[in-house]
Amino acid sequence: LKNYFDTKGKYYNQDNFFIFIPGKYFNYSNIAAGLAGYIIEIRTGKKLNEYSKHFIFNPLKMDNTGWFFSEINLANHSTLYNRETDTLKVIKPYGLTTYPDGGVRTSVSDLSKFFICLLNGGKNNGVRILKKKSVAEMTKPQFTEAVKPDNVDLVKRNEGLFWAFDNNGKRVGHTGGDPGVRTFMYYDTKEKVGIILFMNTELKEAELKNFRTTVYDEIFKYALTLRDNKTSR
C-alpha cells in the first residue's frame, strides 16, 4: 500500500487517482478497502486476520472462515473457473496482496451468521460484536440531495460505509468479484428477507444487468417463499 500511495513508491502512478475534489465523483475503490484494513491494524495493533478472528469469527462461531489458506480447510475450498468463450478453465487458488478488499474465505452458512448479526443491530444469538450505533452508521445512506457526487442518481443508488443501496434503495448489501468468483449479499428492506449467493465462476460486468433481472430476482422470490412457508434451508 505504501508503494501504491507514496509518490516515490514503485507502484505509484498518477493515473490511478482522480482529479475530482472529495465528494464530487463516486467510484468504488478496492485499494481504499485495503487501506481501511490497514488502518484497523494501526489502530488496534493487531493484524487484520487476527483481529477478525478474535472479535468476529470466533464469537459468531464462523468456524469455516479465514483470510488465509493456513486458516481454513482447503479440502472445502471450491474449485474456481474462468470462462473462455464456451469453455471453462480451472483457476488455481490464489491470494490477494490487498486481501482486506475481498480476500476472506467463508461459506454461505458462516457468512449468514455475520449478516444476521448486522441485520439485528450488531448482535446474533446473544453475542454482540458491534454497537447498534455503529451498524446504523454503516448502513445509513451517505448521499443526500444536498450532498452527493455528480455521477450518482439517488433514485437508483446510494452508498453506506462499504454497503450499497440499489433497486431504488429497496435493497442494501454488497457484491463483488474476482477471477473465478462472484458474490452477492443483500437484504430487502421492504420484504424483510436477505440472500447470500456465491458463484465459483466469474460474472462479467456486461452480464450483471441481465443476471439481476433473472437469477438474482428469482432467488429473492424463492426467499419470500421460504419465509412465507416458515421453512429454512
Labelled PLM ranges:
Residues 3-10, 54, 58-62, 83, ...:
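Glycine-rich, acidic and aromatic/proline-enriched surface loops and short helix-turn segments
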Residues 1-30, 46, 82-88, 92:
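Active-site-proximal loop and beta-strand segments within enzyme catalytic domains
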Residues 24, 41-53, 58, 91-233:
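Catalytic loop of the DD-peptidase/beta-lactamase superfamily, centered on the K-T-G motif
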Residues 10, 16-18, 61-65, 123, ...:
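Generic structural signal for secondary-structure transition and capping sites
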Residues 32-37, 112-113:
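Well-ordered alpha-helical segments within folded domains of soluble proteins
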Residues 77-79:
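A small/polar active-site loop signature that marks catalytic segments
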Residues 64-75:
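Short, surface-exposed recognition loops and adjoining beta-strand edges that mediate ligand/DNA contacts
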